[in-house]
């Protein structure tokens, strides 16, 4: 914390202009992860773990041989994750991990078969016991990975925000045995998550799990269909996995998959890379990264226009918004230049060992042209509150016209910036984990300084303690999961650089209901999650749902409660304490449809 405070202060002092600092202090814009900017490192990434493992690699001046079993592969992946995440900030995704692990399953299987054949066992017995041994390796490997990612902080001092995506394969390119093992890899990973850890099976929150949903694949392949049901079962107990649609008629992720065959896995809780094709016209997703996010405080910008230009504020809002976008653009251009001139030794696993696309440079080389495939995110929050200031109605009442007009305006401006600057810019539906409270406080302070009323202090459905997450409807809306999906459809697809759609479930134990919500989200092209509060009682050891403070079985307050923070899960209550700020906790208490 001390280091973060120091680096944040130094960056503000030496890297930001006076105008940038003024806008940050008032709250018009928010530079995410400001404490890490001075280090010149990248943000979220889709790390090419398969490329790093294949043939061996070097880490911290030690040569690693390629793993000879799936157990050692998972153990080494855990080590790589802890080291690589210390060289960046933000989300670290291991994309399509099931397919990465398949060759190591085959190595383990071959070794086990040879061992049991040497013992003179018949072939049926050899297959049975060899498969049993490999399943046990998978169990131990995923248990080891979960324990590392939930108990061992990286050298930056925090836990690696890791995501694993899985579940997509082309049935025509894999044999029956390979498809069964692909299913088994993911089934064991899901089973380990459901079982939790320790004698009482206490749940964990990392890594985030994302199922890659291809409807045609599920219909054509029995192993895919079995895995989808296993995933839904796990979501109904653990909330994860979330689901990414690859086969919808809607959305850029599905479009890229269907046109290029490339999967754009999410990073962090909701970030997505922009489409980028190499010189041969191939869409490259794995091995790319983001350089950071800067978010707008739309309510402050709107209120500023209303106060400074009371007669023409509806026109002046767009002008002021464009000015703020230019500031963000200028900041990102500086970020691209800083990263371009970094030495590759600043992130050796990514830039010298193949973790990133073309990342096989020498340590003393500059990152250079690798920045051409990196994305920068223009973030938006509080579209619900902004809609109220614009129209006097909540987003669900107004119908989403204003929010869509804002996002379309951003999309047009970013297309212009991209053409002029040659950089990949994207609209990011900011998750606002703690920012939900920060921006609300900034708006409240701005109103006090200007001597005007903060309407969110006295208006039903709103709170001065927090702003609504990105484009989502107000958490207090009493609407059904299907209604929420419909209300957020347009804005979700306009925020191509960062989005997730989630619905709150009162009865997650209803498997068919959970499955119906997920399938509907997949038809709509969503990155879909389901929400409920998952509680574990430290006294009676029983699990409950949608409980925050008191065990319904024994009355104990000794609870560990996992809630959806925004796009990812976190502990909202551990024995009466929470790491979330007061604003986020107020939002969690008010949830009806989030």
Q: What label would you give each PLM region?
A:
Residues 549-594:
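Long insertion/accessory domains within large nucleic-acid-processing enzymes
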Residues 379-382, 497, 567, 583:
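Glycine-centered flexibility sites
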Residues 376-389, 408, 564:
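Contiguous, well-ordered alpha-helical segments that form the cores/surfaces of helical PPI scaffolds
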Residues 1-372, 389, 393-560, 570:
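Conserved catalytic cores of very large enzyme subunits
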């Amino acid at each position: 914390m001390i280091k973060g405070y120091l680096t944040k202060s130094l960056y503000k002092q030496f890297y930001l202009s006076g105008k940038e600092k003024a806008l940050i202090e008032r709250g018009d814009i928010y530079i995410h992860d400001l404490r890490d900017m001075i280090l010149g490192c990248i943000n979220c990434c889709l790390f090419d773990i398969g490329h790093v493992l294949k043939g061996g690699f070097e880490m911290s001046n030690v040569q690693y041989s390629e793993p000879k079993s799936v157990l050692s592969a998972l153990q080494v992946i855990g080590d790589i994750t802890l080291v690589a995440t210390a060289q960046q900030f933000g989300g670290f995704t291991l994309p399509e991990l099931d397919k990465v692990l398949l060759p190591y399953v085959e190595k383990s299987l071959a070794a086990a078969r040879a061992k049991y054949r040497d013992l003179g066992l018949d072939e049926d017995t050899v297959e049975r016991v060899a498969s049993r041994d490999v399943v046990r390796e998978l169990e131990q490997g995923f248990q080891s990975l979960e324990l590392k990612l939930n108990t061992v902080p990286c050298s930056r001092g925090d836990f690696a925000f890791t995501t694993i995506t899985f579940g997509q394969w082309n049935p025509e390119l894999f044999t029956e045995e390979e498809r069964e093992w692909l299913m088994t890899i993911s089934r064991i990973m899901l089973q380990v998550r459901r079982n939790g850890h320790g004698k009482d099976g206490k749940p964990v929150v990392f890594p985030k799990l994302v199922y890659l949903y291809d409807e045609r694949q599920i219909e054509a392949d029995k192993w895919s269909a079995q895995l989808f049901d296993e995933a839904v079962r796990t979501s109904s107990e653990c909330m994860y996995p979330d689901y990414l649609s690859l086969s919808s008629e809607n959305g850029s992720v599905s479009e890229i998959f269907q046109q290029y065959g490339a999967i754009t896995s999410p990073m962090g809780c909701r970030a997505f890379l922009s489409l980028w094709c190499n010189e041969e016209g191939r869409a490259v997703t794995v091995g790319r990264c983001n350089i950071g996010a800067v978010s707008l405080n739309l309510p402050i910008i709107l209120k500023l226009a209303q106060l400074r230009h009371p007669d023409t504020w509806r026109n002046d809002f767009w002008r002021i918004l464009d000015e703020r976008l230019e500031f963000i653009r200028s900041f990102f251009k500086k970020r691209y230049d800083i990263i371009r001139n970094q030495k590759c030794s600043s992130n050796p696993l990514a830039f010298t060992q193949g973790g990133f696309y073309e990342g096989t440079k020498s340590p003393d080389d500059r990152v250079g042209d690798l920045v051409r495939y990196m994305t920068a995110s223009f973030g938006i929050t509080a579209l619900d509150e902004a809609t109220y200031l614009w129209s006097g109605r909540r987003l669900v009442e107004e119908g989403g016209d204003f929010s869509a007009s804002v996002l379309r305006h951003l999309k047009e401006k970013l297309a212009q910036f991209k053409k002029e600057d040659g950089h990949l810019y994207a609209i990011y539906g900011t998750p606002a984990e703690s920012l939900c409270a920060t921006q609300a406080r900034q708006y409240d302070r701005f109103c006090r300084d200007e001597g005007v009323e903060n309407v969110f202090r006295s208006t039903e459905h709103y709170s001065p303690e927090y702003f609504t997450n990105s484009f989502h409807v107000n958490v207090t809306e009493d609407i059904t999961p299907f209604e929420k999906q419909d209300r957020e459809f347009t804005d979700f697809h306009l925020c191509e650089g960062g989005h997730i759609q989630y619905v709150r479930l009162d009865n997650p134990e209803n498997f068919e209901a959970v499955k119906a919500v997920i399938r509907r989200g997949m038809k709509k092209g969503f990155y879909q999650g389901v929400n409920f509060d998952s509680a574990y009682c430290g006294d009676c050891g029983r699990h409950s749902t949608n409980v925050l403070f008191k065990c319904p079985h024994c009355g104990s307050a000794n609870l560990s409660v996992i809630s959806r923070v925004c796009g990812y899960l976190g502990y909202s209550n551990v024995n009466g304490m929470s790491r979330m700020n007061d604003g986020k906790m107020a939002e969690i208490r008010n949830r009806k449809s989030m």
